[in-house]
């Protein structure tokens, strides 16, 4: 026992060690996977940093190259400005007409401000009247006032643009600004783009040359964006930018806007046409729906009108009280014959409506019978013959026939017509007998006497009062036997017309029904013989009522 215990302990320890090893492996694998994820995230972050650094370097290089070009141009302009001519002085005066005071040689800062606010900011040639060497020697002093004034100007423009954007949505009037064309184009830009342009422009660097280059790039981008917007925004009134009388760029932009306006008118016209078409189609659909709904409602009304008489004819009348001496004197509250006649009138109307829809069957002529039988032989002689040629040949053969043959064909046609008429009559009788049996069943359930078939000897003494039970008098018995005789004679005629054998099951059922219908009324006669009067009157009257269900028929 001790050896087994030791072995079990060793096995359990080994199992625990295996479990511990498995847990350690899973933890190591988890740590490795987590480390791999961290490494991948670090690599992605490094790639993003590298790409952003590359972009910033490319932008710096682009700005530096542009600023270098602008510096060269500025130096050449300054060199030419050292030797002023009378023509140049006149041009300067014309350019500086919007400024309030004439330029002076001493106030360089004022001249710079006027040059910035003048309409010739687009051109890079800002001609300074005198002392170019001092300005070149001290670039820091020159850049500080210009940059500060430029920033203030930007702030003012931002405020004005914010107000104008809020007013543009309410009114579609064009703005009239006093600033030159470049600043006007800046007003159209969104505040986000302005902030991007301001961040892109270098702050406190090489001075006026870099500021001018950033201004030019921002102007170009602003013009391109406004042109693209004016072409894209067709359905907005804000796309019509204000025009300041000046540069050819503004004229071209206004021309583009006019073209866009024309396109807008065309598009709106097409949209109006489409809307009109859609409205017309909707109206047509609504009309069709209304017509369908009307037809459906009419058919429903007709159906309800047809169902109402049947519902009127079948209300359950009060159960008949026990037979007393005072029952014949009680007047009926609702005459049932009136209800039945109303139902019959409705059925007649329905039949009259259905009759014109059904095609009337024409009488069979001798020529029709002859052509029906002789057509097959002609087709066998001439296969693939046309209908017109076939009818011509049939007419020729009919003309050549002697009178005896024609008479034979006429007799045959008459016989066929008679047969057809008989078949139709039997089908009509069947329908009428089924309707009468249904009416009888309703009468028996409500305590009414069953309506009998028309016959010369059937003189029924049933009263119209619903409370009276059917009588078992000899006249009633005779009426029932007459009905049985009529039905059996009709069955006999039909059997004579049929060619071939008759089913045994059908004949047996007819015989059984006829025996029951004959014995029922005969049993009622026992009530008049005192020695045989053992059956109560109620049972006899019920048997006479139920004969309608057992009446034989094929």
Swiss-Prot record:
CDD domains: HMG-box_HMGXB4. PROSITE patterns: HMG_BOX_2. The keyword Endoplasmic reticulum does not apply. It holds the Pfam family DUF4171. Residues 434-466 have a biased composition (Low complexity). Gene3D superfamilies: High mobility group box domain. SMART domains: HMG (SM00398). Keywords: Developmental protein, DNA-binding, Nucleus, Wnt signaling pathway. GO terms for cellular component: nucleus. Interacts with nlk.2. This is HMG box-containing protein 4. It comes from Xenopus tropicalis (Western clawed frog). The gene is hmgxb4.
């Amino acid at each position: 026992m001790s050896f087994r215990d030791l072995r079990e302990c060793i096995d359990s320890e080994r199992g625990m060690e295996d479990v511990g090893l498995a847990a350690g492996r899973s933890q190591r694998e988890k740590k490795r996977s987590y480390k791999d994820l961290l490494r991948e995230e670090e690599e992605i972050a490094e790639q993003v940093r590298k790409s952003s650094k590359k972009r910033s370097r490319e932008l710096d290089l682009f700005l530096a190259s542009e600023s270098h070009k602008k510096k060269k141009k500025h130096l050449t302009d300054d060199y030419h400005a050292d030797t002023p001519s009378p023509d140049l002085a006149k041009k300067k005066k014309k350019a500086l007409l919007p400024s309030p005071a004439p330029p002076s040689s001493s106030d360089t800062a004022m001249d710079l401000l006027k040059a910035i606010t003048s309409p010739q900011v687009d051109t890079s040639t800002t001609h300074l009247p005198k002392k170019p060497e001092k300005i070149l020697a001290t670039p820091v002093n020159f850049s500080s006032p210009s940059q500060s004034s430029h920033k203030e100007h930007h702030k003012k423009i931002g405020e004005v643009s914010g107000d104008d954007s809020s007013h543009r949505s309410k009114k579609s009037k064009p703005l009239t600004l006093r600033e030159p064309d470049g600043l006007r184009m800046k007003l159209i830009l969104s505040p986000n783009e302005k902030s991007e342009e301001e961040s892109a422009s270098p702050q406190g660097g090489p001075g006026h040359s870099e500021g001018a280059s950033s201004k030019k790039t921002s102007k170009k981008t602003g013009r391109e964006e406004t042109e693209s917007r004016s072409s894209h925004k067709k359905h907005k009134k804000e796309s019509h930018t204000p025009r300041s009388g000046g540069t050819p760029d503004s004229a071209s932009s206004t021309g583009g806007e006019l073209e866009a306006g024309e396109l807008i008118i065309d598009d709106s016209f097409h949209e109006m046409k489409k809307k009109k078409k859609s409205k017309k189609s909707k109206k047509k659909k609504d009309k069709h729906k209304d017509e369908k709904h009307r037809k459906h409602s009419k058919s429903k009304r007709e159906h309800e009108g047809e169902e109402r008489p049947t519902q009127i004819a079948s209300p359950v009348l009060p159960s008949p009280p026990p037979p007393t001496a005072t029952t014949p004197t009680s007047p009926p509250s609702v005459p049932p014959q009136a209800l039945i006649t109303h139902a019959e009138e409705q059925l007649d109307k329905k039949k009259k409506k259905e009759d014109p829809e059904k095609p009337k069957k024409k009488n069979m002529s001798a020529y029709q019978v002859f052509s029906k039988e002789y057509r097959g032989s002609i087709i066998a002689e001439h296969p693939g013959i046309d209908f017109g040629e076939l009818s011509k040949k049939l007419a020729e053969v009919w003309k050549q026939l002697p009178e005896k043959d024609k008479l034979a064909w006429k007799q045959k046609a008459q016989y066929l017509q008679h047969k057809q008429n008989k078949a139709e009559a039997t089908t009509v009788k069947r329908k009428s007998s089924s309707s009468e049996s249904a009416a009888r069943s309703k009468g028996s359930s409500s305590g009414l006497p069953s309506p009998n078939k028309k016959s010369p000897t059937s003189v029924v003494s049933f009263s119209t009062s619903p409370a009276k039970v059917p009588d078992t008098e000899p006249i009633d018995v005779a009426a029932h036997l007459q009905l049985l005789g009529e039905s059996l004679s009709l069955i006999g005629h039909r059997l004579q017309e049929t060619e071939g054998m008759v089913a045994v099951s059908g004949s047996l059922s007819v015989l059984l029904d006829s025996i029951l219908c004959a014995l029922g009324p005969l049993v009622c006669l026992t009530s008049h013989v005192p020695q045989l009067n053992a059956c109560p009157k109620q049972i006899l009257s019920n048997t006479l009522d139920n004969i309608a269900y057992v009446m034989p028929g094929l």
